[in-house]
Amino acid sequence: DPTPEIFAMSETICSEDTFDVLPINGDPTAATIVPLGTTYTWSVLPGLEVTGASDEVIPQNSVNITTDLINSSNIDQEVIYTVTPTSDQGCVGPTFELTITIEPRPIISDKTDAICSGDTFTLSPTNNAPVEIVPANTLYSWVIQSPNTDLTFLTGYSAETDQPLISQTLINTSDEVKTITYIIIPNTGNCEGLPFELDVAVSPGPFVEDIVLDPICSEDTFVVAPITGIPNNNIIVPAGTTYTWTVIDNL
């Protein structure tokens, strides 16, 4: 009866994924012997920052992990399985190693920011594993969501794909704060993270054109209280706007 002869194998997966490896007779070379009905048991040497790996003493039809392997770091981790193949006739082959590389998957929580109209916001998430996992070279794609805010008076925003950071210059031409919500998907290589939200509150900036008053008499007072939209739509006076001034003498 033939005895299984299987050589070292490897597989790469993303964090939180499972794997299923089935050795094939004659693959990758004719030296690989996998009799029909071969089963497998294994012991595992887990990576320091990987959970979900375990030994298997009950013979299995393939080398598979039905529990997610989780990489809690922001770099690749390896798990090494020492596998014992046994033919259906009870012939035990030499052990072989199966190395599983677990690539990190980005995990980023929701964020907020606040800027003034005309300013640029920039978000570059930083790694704080295992709470927030940001592998090197993570890219970001996003769309705009505005479920509770009218964005008519907000400009400068757009959906983007595969950006190294999240950054846009936003202009608010209304007289009230506008909040825009970005739905962002982080991606590292082949490993895509769950979407997270970024809320950016954009405060309006006052804009008042030069004002010329009618003449007044000596010892009279004058009051100027600019109003949004008067005398034209260029005038923006957010609630709570205050003023300072200097005087130019007209000699």
Label the predicted regions.
Residues 1-251:
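Extracellular low-complexity Ser/Thr/Asn/Gly-rich intrinsically disordered segments
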